[in-house]
């Protein structure tokens, strides 16, 4: 290395480059694992104990505990299940796992559409009110610091409950494109003060980041599906004040939003004659276009471990090829999730393995995606009485790995995995625990 001694400037330049390369490289290939704490108190096969959670932690860089909420009067962070988090000390039981898994950072997430009003609907109003007043933000910030320190969390994740875009009817591609463009310039349909809230959210992050940095704690943001980044997120300011952002690149179509049309819930690329924004690539590209190449490693792509399911009717046809017309809302709940229109990976795997002669649960026909661009689905056409029809679009280990490969190819930070409790955490399908999580990790 005599040339370094002769030219110290080049040596300094090389050291700077290596430091940049190492810091950037260290930030890619991350796996953010979301943990629905309600899985701990569910009954039956959906219940996931801490012992069943632990095998996943060897693959996770971050564990995000979901979810806390906000008090509508004091604007302080609050538990959404005090009997679990306080009486049973569940927060501390989770963060105590750090002793066995020191490589994992434990975050507490706020919002996530779990903070609901008296009607059981995600409450966005108080999240906007908190942003609007400086004293409300200060109350929230102080309570966050106390909650993290009291329970041993390494940081806070803001899955902020902004108003969601309204569902759009299926229509031709020209109308889809025009509707999307028109939506960029009009915010009155979901929030007349979106510009103010956009700036106020950036201010909240700047203030909160300043407090958290003193204690070496993390600040992250999780975008929820159907929340418009164009309306509510100042991308450069947000990325400059957070450690990373988990993109809501899933649930583009759901039975709740689109009860009459079944379609692939999470295509990787744009599909013909669909909303051009309803795919992973579009969402990622929007964020990449708004920031510098240096900050791209802060973006994590959301990947799920479940499927969205609709009832097929006689008028839905027999081919199963999406989009499926004349669907009849959410399919019946599974034995594990017990939620209409939502099936976990082990529930889907079980349905796929049923034999045709099984009268209780007739088998589904799986249709793959040789293009590796849009996703897979399985279906059962309605019978002569118009009953027992089912259509489900979902992720499996292979499609999740394809998305992880996309993340790697784009130079993004990693994957945000939703949710550990929906993966096959008992290995009941193929004998391997957390197969989707594993497939993502190995591809990253």
Curated annotation (Swiss-Prot):
One of its GO terms (biological process) is chitin catabolic process. Residues 1-26 form the signal peptide. InterPro entries: Chitinase_II/V-like_cat, Chitinase_insertion_sf, Glyco_hydro18_cat, Glycoside_hydrolase_SF, Glycosyl_Hydrlase_18, IDGF. Probably required to stimulate the proliferation, polarization and motility of imaginal disk cells. May act by stabilizing the binding of insulin-like peptides to its receptor through a simultaneous interaction with both molecules to form a multiprotein signaling complex. The keyword Kinase does not apply. Disulfide bonds join 33-60, 349-429. CDD domains: GH18_IDGF. Residues 29-444 form the GH18 domain. Belongs to the glycosyl hydrolase 18 family. IDGF subfamily. Transmembrane segments: none annotated. This is Chitinase-like protein Idgf5. Keywords: Developmental protein, Disulfide bond, Glycoprotein, Secreted, Signal. It comes from Drosophila melanogaster (Fruit fly).
